[in-house]
Amino acid sequence: MEELKLNTIEEAIADFREGKFVIVVDDEDRENEGDLIVAAEKITPEQVNFMLKHARGVLCAPITISRCKELELPHQVDTNTSVLGTPFTVTVDKLEGCSTGVSIHDRAATIRALADPTSTPETFGRPGHVNPLYAQDKGVLRRAGHTEACIDMARLAGLYPAAALMEIMSEDGTMARLPELRKMADEWGLKLISIRDLIAYRLKQESLVEKGVEVDMPTEYGHFRLIPFRQKSNGLEHIAIIKGDIKEGEPVLVRVHSSCATGDIFGSMRCDCGEQLHKALQMIEKEGKGAVVYLNQEGRGIGLMEKMKAYKLQENGVDTVEANILLGHQADERDYGVGAQILRSIGVTQMRLLTNNPVKRVGLESYGLSIVENVPIEITPNKYNERYLKTKKDRMGHTLHFNK
């Protein structure tokens, strides 16, 4: 990416503030696509026309979750099964001053109205021709997507947190990717940035966690150091368990482990969580250096109460993924941004990651951390967790090799 001469985030913010387009590209391990984005409050009919003529994707309008609630815009579907969980709301058109909602004038007016604090639910007709999107709170530090990048750019520019975006297609109808996006940006006179760089910019500007006091912690697996961290946004407390002297830039063995009270504490055989945690500590002790980041994200981020509801559904025949979806959650709602900042805080920027989960790798790499090796951490299945592990392999892409 460096060879393609991406623009700086500061340059892009300045243009975005003036109402100019910016091209944003995401990670190769995600969509690896470029989106044309512009501030919602600044958009003109001519810009809508440019997007339709040159980008040719789907016209969307990212707004905050709180704004969606204010405007009474529910999710487009109750169960989101799209590949990346794209959070569409019902489609809308601005009613007053518009006709069918299709014209460039009408669509620009609708997008501007989404960014108008005086707009109410009655401002819009449903369905319409603009696709609002729910943007996750905390922006790209929560979800490394174009939707969140739009909201972050608006906030960094001092504008209302709403934008318009459209995916950029090549002439042959395939998705435009680097280096073609660089050529397009040069041809159109636009700034080109990456979500990875936007994440790095925010991580330098903001602190997500408060670091606690470090203590020694002898365990049955070896002697470690423990540092607690408090997440500023919600008060959740996380833990870093460290072995040895970690030097910045040195690839060390790392396990990012989400809390599982049933498995980690009570030894539940319905999952492999506790065994993975204990095995990770043993491996790090044997290595003589490394860290476990223990995140307070029970049930893949849905909490203990919801996890128990999911367990009950599983007892009635659904699998772990279906259970989450039936309860209105995504299959995996974990936030790796806070884990990435904890790792940076203890000096880890390169790691040999203990995981079977490809999403975890992508999640951490999206925050500028380098994973030099994936180290498997497989557990022998038992009769209680056999189906759970098979679901993780078949439906969540986990790298598991048991034959059950």
Curated annotation (Swiss-Prot):
Enzyme Commission number(s) from the entry: 4.1.99.12, 3.5.4.25
Protein residues bound to Mg(2+) 1: 31
Cofactor note: Binds 2 divalent metal cations per subunit. Magnesium or manganese. Binds 1 zinc ion per subunit.
Pathway(s) of this molecule: Cofactor biosynthesis; riboflavin biosynthesis; 2-hydroxy-3-oxobutyl phosphate from D-ribulose 5-phosphate: step 1/1; Cofactor biosynthesis; riboflavin biosynthesis; 5-amino-6-(D-ribitylamino)uracil from GTP: step 1/4
Binding site residues for GTP: 255-259, 276, 298-300, 320, 355, 360
Active site annotation, chain numbering: 332 (proton acceptor), 334 (nucleophile)
Pfam families on file: DHBP_synthase (PF00926), GTP_cyclohydro2 (PF00925)
DHBP synthase: annotated span: 1-204
Binding site for Zn(2+): 260, 271, 273
Region spans: GTP cyclohydrolase II: 205-404
Alphabetical GO biological process terms: riboflavin biosynthetic process
Family to which the UniProt record says this protein belongs: In the N-terminal section; belongs to the DHBP synthase family. In the C-terminal section; belongs to the GTP cyclohydrolase II family.
Role summary: Catalyzes the conversion of D-ribulose 5-phosphate to formate and 3,4-dihydroxy-2-butanone 4-phosphate.
Protein name as catalogued: Riboflavin biosynthesis protein RibBA
Organism: Phocaeicola vulgatus (strain ATCC 8482 / DSM 1447 / JCM 5826 / CCUG 4940 / NBRC 14291 / NCTC 11154) (Bacteroides vulgatus)
Gene name for this UniProt entry: ribBA
